[in-house]
């Protein structure tokens, strides 16, 4: 009988609990024991582990956040810290590890695998910034949260004939801004992958105003710069009445969508099956609605391809 360790690491994402549930229940179904590790790699080094059972994951599929909590851990980034982690895992007779998180979490799983400890990664991040998978757990829910906010902001924007800048998460990847902006009917979408000047944005505002449209929504990915700075510069160039909304951590919360719950469930079960097959240093993901797995190193080496077609479509539809 295998014993599986399970942790969530990095930024939380809606659907992580659904993945936790899937790992625990499928592992027990296959006759395994599961230890939940609280607060990620930090909790592992502090031996904050709890054996999980079926009731541990009851009534959590609909909950946002992660019942295992999450944190970041500088000590784990050191060789000494990782050796300590392996020693603790062996102390609890844990045979393998499932890590739910993003690229940093996967890098940690790779390091453990390099030390001979089997680990599998499940993609959980709202940014959707992992190139090897079409979607990450939490992305769909975060998009829906943003779209809901854009709709409400548009109501007041149109009432007062204002330009509203909505800042969303996405340091290096503009997927949240792009797809939420497209689905929310934003007049301008600003992402890290496409260079656009303040003058160009101001010209778009002036053009729409000349057509008689007195309000606009600009969706800005945080990785491009701050919404407040953009507001000041646009005010100078366009003279428009502007307001800023920074959605912040509200994007990470909320009950996961159907898509995220199903994705998390499928990935969780597949991760357990890989471990039972003796696989290690791999991540699971989804491509064209099929569950895939590949080496962590290969997954992290892939470069995210920006959806230029969707971006151009958004420009066409925002005239």
Swiss-Prot record:
The active site is at 127 (proton acceptor). Its EC number is 2.7.1.11. It catalyses: beta-D-fructose 6-phosphate + ATP = beta-D-fructose 1,6-bisphosphate + ADP + H(+). Pfam families: PFK (PF00365). Substrate binds at residues 125-127, 162, 169-171, 222, 243, 249-252. It is found in: Cytoplasm. GO terms for biological process: canonical glycolysis; fructose 1,6-bisphosphate metabolic process; fructose 6-phosphate metabolic process. Allosterically activated by ADP and other diphosphonucleosides, and allosterically inhibited by phosphoenolpyruvate. GO terms for molecular function: 6-phosphofructokinase activity; AMP binding; ATP binding; fructose-6-phosphate binding; identical protein binding; metal ion binding; monosaccharide binding. Pathway: Carbohydrate degradation; glycolysis; D-glyceraldehyde 3-phosphate and glycerone phosphate from D-glucose: step 3/4. Mg(2+) binds at residue 103. The keyword Transcription does not apply. Homotetramer. This is ATP-dependent 6-phosphofructokinase.
């Amino acid at each position: 009988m295998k014993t599986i360790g399970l942790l969530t690491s990095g930024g939380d994402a809606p659907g992580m609990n659904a993945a936790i549930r899937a790992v625990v229940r499928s592992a027990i179904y296959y006759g395994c024991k599961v230890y939940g590790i609280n607060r990620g790699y930090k909790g592992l080094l502090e031996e904050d582990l709890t054996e999980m059972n079926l009731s541990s994951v009851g009534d959590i599929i609909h909950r946002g956040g992660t019942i295992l909590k999450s944190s970041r851990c500088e000590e784990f980034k050191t060789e000494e810290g990782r050796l300590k982690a392996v020693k603790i895992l062996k102390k609890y007779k844990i045979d393998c590890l499932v890590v739910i998180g993003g690229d940093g979490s996967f890098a940690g799983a790779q390091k453990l695998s390099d030390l001979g400890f089997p680990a599998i990664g499940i993609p959980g991040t709202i940014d959707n910034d992992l190139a090897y998978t079409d979607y990450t757990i939490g992305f769909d829910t975060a998009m829906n949260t943003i779209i809901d906010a854009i709709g409400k902001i548009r109501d007041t924007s149109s009432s007062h004939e204002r330009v509203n800048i909505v800042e969303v998460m996405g340091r290096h990847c503009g997927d949240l801004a792009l797809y939420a902006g497209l689905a929310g009917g934003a007049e301008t979408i600003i992402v890290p992958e496409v260079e656009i000047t303040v003058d160009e944005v101001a010209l778009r505002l002036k053009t729409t105003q000349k057509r008689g449209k007195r309000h606009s929504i600009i969706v800005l990915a945080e990785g491009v710069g701050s919404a407040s700075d953009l507001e000041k510069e646009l005010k100078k160039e366009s003279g428009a009445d502007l307001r800023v909304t920074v959605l912040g951590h509200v994007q990470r919360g909320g009950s996961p969508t159907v898509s995220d719950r199903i994705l998390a469930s499928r990935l969780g079960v597949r991760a357990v099956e890989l471990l039972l097959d003796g696989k290690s240093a791999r991540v699971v993901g989804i491509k064209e609605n099929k569950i895939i797995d590949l080496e962590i190193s290969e997954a992290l080496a892939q470069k995210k391809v920006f959806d230029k077609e969707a971006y151009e479509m958004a420009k066409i539809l925002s005239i």
